[in-house]
């Protein structure tokens, strides 16, 4: 499995409110996650980085994704609603042995699966971390096949391509083999 990441701060800011995690587990699974802090700048960066670091610690400790999200949400809320802003979480856990991807979304932007010239969109209407005491997320399982591309993005990218059929653009992209 090949992975790649690109990010950029808003405007001239050296801070980006998005942070990410890619973790390969011994059991043949790979976890990819994007946390997006509300707003932009240093505060959004710090808050999303905290969520990603907590997720990484939970994964390293052997927590499953449900327990990890419950723990992270509880810790985030314990910080106090006046001291933190909500953070979106987009997480995909891919079992490289079976090809099953479990996509978990909490207020996150769409995820795209590109297969040949078609694009499947996974959307969610859930709330971000830190809004409700009980974790609000949607989980969708998808079968991936050799040659598929999973494209996870934050709302910052999608917001900067207004009035365009994003699925159509992604279907036209040709991704070269390494």
What would you call each of these model-derived segments?
Residues 1, 45-116:
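Catalytic core of PPM/PP2C metal-dependent serine/threonine phosphatase domains
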Residues 1-18, 73-79, 109-141:
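PP2C/PPM family metal-dependent serine/threonine protein phosphatase catalytic domain
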Residues 1-38, 43, 49-53, 137-140:
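N-terminal entry segment of metal-dependent catalytic domains or homologous docking segments
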Residues 30-33, 103, 150-153:
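Short hydrophobic-aromatic micro-motifs
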Residues 43-44, 102, 112-114, 120-123, ...:
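Extended hydrophobic-aromatic, low-complexity segments
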Residues 1-5, 173-178:
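Short intrinsically disordered, low-complexity coil segments enriched in acidic
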Residues 39-61, 148-176:
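Active-site-proximal, acidic helix/loop segment immediately C-terminal to a metal-coordinating Asp/Glu
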Residues 13-26, 87-89, 122-163:
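Acidic loop->beta-strand submotif enriched in PP2C/PPM serine/threonine phosphatases
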């Amino acid at each position: 499995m090949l992975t790649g990441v690109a990010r950029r701060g808003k405007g001239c800011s050296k801070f980006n409110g998005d942070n990410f995690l890619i973790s390969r587990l011994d059991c043949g699974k790979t976890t990819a996650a994007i946390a997006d802090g509300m707003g932009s700048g240093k505060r959004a960066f710090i808050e999303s980085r905290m969520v990603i670091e907590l997720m990484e610690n939970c994964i390293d400790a052997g927590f499953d994704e449900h327990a990890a999200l419950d723990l992270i949400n509880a810790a985030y809320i314990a910080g106090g609603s006046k001291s933190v802003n909500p953070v979106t979480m987009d997480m995909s856990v891919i079992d490289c042995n079976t090809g099953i991807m479990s996509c978990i979304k909490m207020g996150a932007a769409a995820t795209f699966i590109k297969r040949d010239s078609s694009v499947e969109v996974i959307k969610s209407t859930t709330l971000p971390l830190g809004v409700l005491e009980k974790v609000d997320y949607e989980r969708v399982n998808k079968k991936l096949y050799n040659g598929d591309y999973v494209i996870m993005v934050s709302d910052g990218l999608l917001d900067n391509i207004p009035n365009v059929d994003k699925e159509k653009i992604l279907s036209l992209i040709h991704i070269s083999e390494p």
